[in-house]
């Protein structure tokens, strides 16, 4: 049987992670500063949380996430993440989002759209944000882990409303 065109698929009703770790090292690229997330050298530890209705199909992951917690080597922390989430090479979409990070809290719907995974390397210019947020607090020091240029800008920002655009050109 020819399986060369078979799409990789995993499905699970439920999954629980307790103190997991994910590490990715691109040996062809030097390590960036440790105070920002380096997508070529990820080291995510203390991963704990519950997942339901999980589907992994090709490069896409869909799941309901409950109380996900983790720490990235840069110092970025997710203190709590609850959401219905889709992650793929074209972006991340979250519904019913509650995200508590080092200093901020995001409630609502949030999406990041990209052309490819490599777009995250130029986060400010290439990642399109689209969010409907309720009673949220964005702290630019949290965003600085992805885009160091925004560190210490207008912090914190409390708001409810719709946000769209790249970080460099928010509307």
State where each predicted segment sits:
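Extracytoplasmic loops and strand-loop junctions of Gram-negative outer membrane beta-barrel proteins
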Residues: 142-145
